[in-house]
Each structure stands twice: as C-alpha cells, then as structure tokens.
C-alpha cells in the first residue's frame, strides 16, 4: 500500500468484510521465553469504515518441540475488538486476554501463529488491513 503525499509504502494483509480469512507465520521464540501464556496487539488500518464500526481479530498458536508431529491442534483462539478511528490511520488494538499456546511452547522453540478477522463478530464495512502483530511474553531470565 502507498500512503499518498509522502510516499510512505508498507505491506498489509487484507481481510475482507464477508469471508473469514486467515494468515499464518512461524516464529522462533527467544531463549528466555518462559513457556507461559502470551498476549497480542493488532496494528492495522482500513480500506473503508465509519466511526461506529469495529473489527474483531482472532489469534491462536501452537508450539513445537523436536520430533513433534506438525499436524496438531492449536491452543484456544482469543479475540479482541477494536473501533474504527479514521480512514488510513494506524489503529492499535488493546491487548488480548491471555493466549495459551497449544503443544510444547518453550524458549528457543518454534511457534506457529494463526490470525484472522472474525467477520461474524465485527461490522466494519471495508477491508481490514493488518500491518503487524505485537506479541508479549513472560521471561524466565533477563538475558539470552
């Protein structure tokens, strides 16, 4: 996406208003991650919307140890709703409630994150454009 006057370019994942779409990525958790619950904030913008409308984001995750089978269930999905503020502005959601990562989460291990727009739970008329997801986690030590 290009933001007009100042030629600010940025990548987004567009989630439409009628179909629940999902995105996935793998992150190697830092060595000092304590293996406990995490929270997430969604950084997003929009293609269209109005001041009374909201977007609801969902996130779930699965952690893996060496030799774990890949095809296993995620932890329970957690959602957070955020209100439309202004066309083309950065929107930062509140933090989700605690997310329990399914499987074997631990420091230094991979986690597959799965996010989506929960279209049945929101009412924003335009596409929601996901820019980033901030993950907060507990630590077991102060250094890696």
Indicate where each model-derived feature is located.
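Proprotein-processing/basic-patch segments
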Residues: 116-144
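N-terminal leader/pro-regions and domain N-caps
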Residues: 1-18
């Amino acid at each position: 996406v290009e933001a007009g006057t100042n030629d600010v370019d940025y990548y987004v994942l567009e989630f439409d208003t009628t179909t629940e779409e999902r995105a996935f990525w793998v992150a190697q958790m830092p060595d000092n991650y304590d293996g406990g619950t995490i929270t997430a904030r969604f950084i997003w913008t929009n293609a269209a919307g109005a001041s009374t409308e909201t977007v609801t984001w969902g996130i779930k995750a699965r952690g893996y140890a060496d030799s774990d089978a890949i095809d296993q269930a995620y932890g329970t999905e957690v959602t957070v709703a955020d209100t439309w503020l202004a066309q083309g502005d950065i929107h930062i959601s509140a933090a989700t409630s605690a997310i329990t990562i399914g499987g074997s989460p631990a420091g230094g291990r991979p986690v597959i994150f799965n996010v989506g727009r929960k279209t049945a739970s929101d009412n924003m008329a335009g596409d929601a454009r996901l820019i980033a997801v901030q993950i907060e986690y507990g630590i077991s030590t102060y250094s890696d």
